[in-house]
């Protein structure tokens, strides 16, 4: 959420640095395998957004140390497995975790990609990483793909061939599958009420990002109202660690075997901040450091839009009211996409269409 609220990078740099710690690496971030992969992926996303190569030069040895730790604990197929001290988390959901987990492998695949891209940015040889990217994709498709279900199963060791949403969501977000398959995932998995629902604001963000990426903005807007809004209607003033709309009363507050063990102020629930800026206001960098960026608003159900979105080291202001769209920014390199047409955005000159 920090990068979605402020163009000041110092907080993000401090956060990334603190999460890596200092080598040697002896355990995953928070002991959670997924968080280690996500930190490496997030480091690339920070660089792509800011172009801050000096920070990448500084943090790369720590990223490489964490990456090497991840790789050292893979199995003979190059898959993430739970080693002593590990926590294969992904989400608080009914996932078959009895063996290697598909969603975890897709995160690893993207971490391989991120290391390749970071290494290339520093002028290094990315071959070892790109080879792992290709090899892992083949293994995932061989072991986790179920042609009859047209889905990635949670794991292949139990015989259950259980399908949850998580692998499909990551596959959509990281372009692990083509558009046709992604659309099938929406129809057969994400819109399928027989597939276990997500019950954390944390992972609900990823699901809504997948919907938005494929053009289903209204679904995401309705979910913001019903899911995050559901907590507010129950009296929440901050967002909870977990929320299951089917629960009632004090059951909402129980977690970790404790009747009142749930965090009711959890930063991982801040996903709408990103969703609204990225997909409704439609602001995104299209090249490293946001030297080029697009503004492609998608109001969906909203009649008006007013927002300021960080991009690069500055901001883009987007206002939609009474059918008039206005974009302002102190940056060069912007393009407005609106009603199928593209308009160059001039630095410091309001553009109204």
Predicted regions span which residues?
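Aromatic-rich carbohydrate-recognition surfaces in CAZymes
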Residues: 1-89, 97-115, 119
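Short Gly/Pro-enriched turn/cap motifs at secondary-structure boundaries
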Residues: 29-30, 160-163, 264-267
């Amino acid at each position: 959420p920090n990068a979605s609220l402020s163009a000041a990078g110092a907080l993000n740099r401090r956060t990334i640095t603190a999460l890596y710690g200092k080598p040697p690496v002896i355990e995953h971030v928070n002991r959670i395998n997924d968080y280690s992969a996500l930190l490496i992926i997030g480091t690339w996303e920070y660089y792509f957004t800011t172009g801050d190569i000096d920070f990448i030069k500084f943090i790369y040895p720590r990223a490489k140390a964490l990456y090497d730790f991840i790789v050292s604990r893979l199995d003979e197929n190059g898959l993430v497995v739970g080693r002593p001290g590990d926590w294969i988390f992904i989400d608080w959901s009914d996932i078959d975790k009895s063996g290697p987990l598909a969603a975890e492998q897709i995160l690893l695949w993207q971490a391989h990609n991120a290391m390749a891209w970071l290494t290339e940015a520093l002028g290094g040889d990315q071959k070892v990483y790109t080879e792992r990217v290709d090899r892992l994709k083949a293994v995932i498709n061989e072991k986790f793909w179920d042609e009859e279900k047209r889905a990635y199963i949670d794991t292949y060791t139990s015989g259950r061939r259980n399908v949850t949403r998580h692998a499909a969501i990551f596959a959509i977000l990281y372009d692990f599958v083509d558009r046709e398959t992604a659309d099938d995932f929406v129809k057969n998995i994400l819109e399928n009420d027989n597939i276990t629902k997500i019950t954390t604001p944390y992972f609900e963000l990823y699901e809504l990002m997948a919907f938005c990426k494929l053009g289903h903005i209204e679904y995401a807007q309705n979910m913001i109202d019903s899911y995050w809004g559901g907590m507010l209607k129950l009296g929440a003033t901050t967002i909870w660690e977990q929320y299951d709309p089917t629960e009632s009363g004090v059951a909402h507050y129980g977690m970790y075997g404790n009747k009142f063990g749930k965090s009711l102020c959890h930063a991982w629930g801040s996903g709408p901040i990103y969703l609204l800026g990225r997909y409704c206001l439609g602001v995104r960098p299209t090249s490293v450091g946001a030297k080029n960026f697009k503004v492609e608003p998608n109001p969906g159900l909203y009649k008006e839009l007013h927002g300021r979105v960080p991009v690069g080291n500055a901001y883009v202001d987007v206002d939609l009211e009474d059918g008039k769209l206005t974009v302002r920014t102190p940056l060069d390199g912007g393009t407005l996409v609106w009603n199928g047409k593209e308009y160059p955005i001039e630095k410091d000159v309001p553009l109204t269409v």
